[in-house]
Regions:
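Basic/polar N-terminal segments that are highly enriched at the extreme N-terminus
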Residues: 1-15, 188-200
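Acidic/glycine-enriched connector segments
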Residues: 5-7, 12-149, 156, 163-178
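Charged phosphate-binding loop/patch that engages nucleotide di/tri-phosphates or the phosphate backbone
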Residues: 159-162, 166-196, 200
Length: 200
C-alpha cells in the first residue's frame, strides 16, 4: 500500500543518508549510480559471487554477498536492513519486483511504488503529474517517514532497454530535491555509518 503524501513543507531537510540496492541491472544500478553522483553512501546485499544477469556486479558497488545465490534472499535482507523501500516501475509490476513488494509488506516496512511511464499508475484518472511534481511527492514521503536508509528496487535491465535511464533521471532529480536547504541547493554528503541489523 502506497504511503499517502501530506502537506509537509519541503523546507524540512531530509535525513536520507544511505541508498541500499541489490546491484542488479536496471533500477538497482540506477539507484547506486545516482546516489554515488549525489555523494550519498551506498550499500546493500547481493547474491553470492555477486551474481547478476550480466555476469558479476562491478566492484565499484560495495555490496555484501549473502550465503545464497538466490535473488530472493538479498531482496528480503535489503528490505530488512532499510527504513523503507521505494520501487520504481515503468508500467507494470513484474514477478521479481512483486517479491520486493511482498517482502516489504510482510516485514511491515514503509513502501512506495512509483510508476515512471505516463498513464501507467493505477487509478490515475485526473490530470497527469509532471516529472518534477512526482519527484517532489516522493521527496515529501521520504521526509515525512524520516527515512535514513532507503532501499530502491525495480525491474532488471533486460525487461526494457529504457528502464535504467528513466530510473537514473528520476532518482538523480530526487536526490537533488531532498538535499534542498532553504536559500541554497547543495548535495548533502552522507555521514551515516551503516551497521547491519543482524544476519540470518
Amino acid at each position: 500500500m502506497e504511503s499517502a503524501i501530506t502537506g509537509r513543507s519541503r523546507s524540512t531537510v531530509s535525513q536520507l543518508s544511505r541508498i541500499v540496492s541489490g546491484g542488479h541491472t536496471g533500477v538497482d544500478r540506477a539507484a547506486l549510480d545516482a546516489a554515488l553522483a549525489a555523494g550519498i553512501e551506498i550499500g546493500g546485499w547481493c547474491p553470492r559471487d555477486r551474481r547478476s544477469e550480466d555476469g558479476i556486479i562491478p566492484a565499484r558497488y560495495p555490496l555484501r554477498e549473502t550465503a545464497s545465490r538466490s535473488y530472493a534472499v538479498r531482496t528480503e535482507w535489503n528490505v530488512r536492513d532499510s527504513d523503507a523501500t521505494l520501487i520504481l516501475v515503468l508500467d507494470r509490476i513484474s514477478s521479481g519486483t512483486r517479491l520486493t513488494v511482498d517482502s516489504a509488506k510482510s516485514q511491515g516496512q514503509p513502501l512506495r511504488i512509483e510508476y515512471l511511464c505516463e498513464n501507467s499508475k493505477p487509478g490515475l484518472l485526473t490530470e497527469e503529474l509532471s516529472l518534477e511534481h512526482r519527484v517532489a511527492e516522493v521527496g515529501d514521503w521520504i521526509r515525512r517517514e524520516q527515512i535514513q536508509t532507503l532501499n530502491v528496487a525495480g525491474p532488471r535491465g533486460s525487461s526494457r532497454k529504457d528502464v535504467y535511464l528513466k530510473s537514473l533521471e528520476f532518482l538523480s532529480m530526487l536526490f537533488a530535491e531532498i538535499s534542498v536547504v532553504p536559500g541554497r541547493r547543495t548535495v548533502k554528503k552522507a555521514k551515516h555509518k551503516y551497521t547491519p541489523r543482524g544476519q540470518d
